[in-house]
Regions:
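Class II aminoacyl-tRNA synthetase catalytic cores and aaRS-like
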Residues: 1-390, 394
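N-terminal low-complexity segments that are often proline-rich with Ser/Thr-Pro
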Residues: 395-399
Length: 399
């Protein structure tokens, strides 16, 4: 394989029994059975291999090596007496003739167990990132990213797009966030900016006659961290098409994205083509957002006809919108906090009521709803343990 190893730690099989081999990796675990018998697990990028030391000298050598030290093992492959069907290498083990320490781990105790690194706090994981990345679960995320990017490149190329890398150091062109600035050494007092997106460059390409462009583009924005991205930078599939309509762009993405999500997605929830089209007005009226998360089955309903004339002052002369929440079993404290949060975000004061276990309207504005209970229950499909949150808004038109 290479001059330093003949096989990887995930490669050996029963058909290799009797072969003289050399593997390299990290000492993952050591189990001592006695002074002349010990089992070690050596791990590399590709998997793990069990090493069996059967002499006092070899056991003593393994005991002197701290876990996660880098070692090489030269020995002979043999069939295991006790096989592990859960491992690709579970039918074999290696009897070492020589073990060499290539890089010694200086500490007996690690900052966290490798296979549980995600349980450690973020600062510790980042400080010992080289250990965190040895966790198979973390490593597999990096591999998944590589596979998705490769699939995107292949799909875009098949659709006639050229991958063109655009400049990183550029002039400032504010696009909604703050720029990252880089001092220009030869021009004191002047700065380069890191691009928030390659917008101007891809437009330049189109005016230059290039027909279809894409890249896995780094974007830099000096903004606070979010739950789904690191502070400052992220990567996106950036694309541009000449002489194209909105539907032309949709058609490309409907071909490119569903197969990738179907192949690499954790859940089988990839949208099939054609993608659902939601007009802006409908999105705002039904979901209260121009980018609704359709996985959340909570829609806004216009109940002005039901509650606009129920006698409750704030509803009179206003549009009344409602959200029905099913399987609701929270405390009054939770309801009050939620409504307070909604008021801060929306600027309007929300009200609530629910159908209790006896089928009665209770809570909030219940006394105004009780006289029209049957109409409300029928129109909104209310069932026991459903909470109904209503909010008046001024009459307005969305165009």
């Amino acid at each position: 394989m290479t001059q330093n190893r003949t096989h990887t730690c995930g490669e050996l099989r029963l058909s290799d029994a009797g072969k003289a081999i050399k593997i390299c990796g990290w000492l993952e675990n050591l189990r001592e059975v006695g002074s002349e018998l010990a089992f070690a697990v050596v791990r590399d990028f590709y998997g793990t291999t069990q090493v069996v030391a059967e002499t006092a000298d070899m056991v003593a050598l393994l005991k002197s090596i701290n876990k996660e030290s880098t070692i090489s093992v030269e020995g002979t492959v043999r069939e295991r007496d006790s096989k592990n069907a859960k491992l690709p290498t579970g039918e074999i083990e290696v009897v070492p003739g020589k073990i060499e320490v290539l890089g010694r781990c200086q500490h007996n105790e690690l900052p966290f167990p490798i296979n549980r690194s995600r349980e450690a706090d973020e600062a510790t994981r980042l400080k010992y990132r080289y250990l965190d990345l040895r966790n198979p679960a973390v490593k597999n995320n990096i591999i998944l990213r590589c596979q998705v990017v490769a699939a995107l490149r292949q799909a875009m190329t098949e659709h006639g797009f050229l991958e063109i890398t655009t400049p990183i150091l550029t002039a400032s062109s504010p696009e909604g966030a703050r720029d990252y600035l880089v001092p220009a050494r030869n021009h004191p007092g002047k700065f380069y900016a890191l691009p928030q997106a390659p917008q101007q460059f891809k437009q330049l390409l189109m005016t230059s006659g290039f027909d279809r462009y894409f890249q896995i583009a780094p974007c830099f924005r000096d903004e606070d961290a979010r739950a789904d991205r690191s502070p400052g930078e992220f990567y996106q599939l950036d694309m541009e098409m000449a002489f194209a309509s909105q539907d032309d762009v949709f058609a490309v993405l409907e071909d490119v994205l569903p197969p990738i999500f179907a192949k690499y997605g954790k859940y089988d929830r990839a949208s099939s083509a054609p993608f659902m089209r939601i007009p802006y007005t409908e999105a705002m009226e039904k979901y209260g957002s121009d980018k609704p998360d359709l996985r959340i089955d909570l829609t806004v309903q216009d109940v002005t006809g039901l509650l606009g004339s129920c006698g409750f002052g704030p509803f009179e002369g206003n549009v009344v919108k409602a959200v029905v929440v099913s399987d609701f079993h929270e405390t009054r404290k939770f309801i009050d906090k939620t409504l307070a949060d909604v008021e801060v975000v929306s600027g309007g004061k929300p009200y609530w009521f629910r159908l209790d276990e006896n089928g009665e309207i209770v809570g909030g504005i219940a006394k105004f709803v009780q006289p029209i209970k049957e109409s409300v229950v029928s129109a909104l499909g209310l069932k026991l343990s459903l909470i109904h949150i209503s909010e008046p808004t001024r009459l307005r038109r969305i165009s």
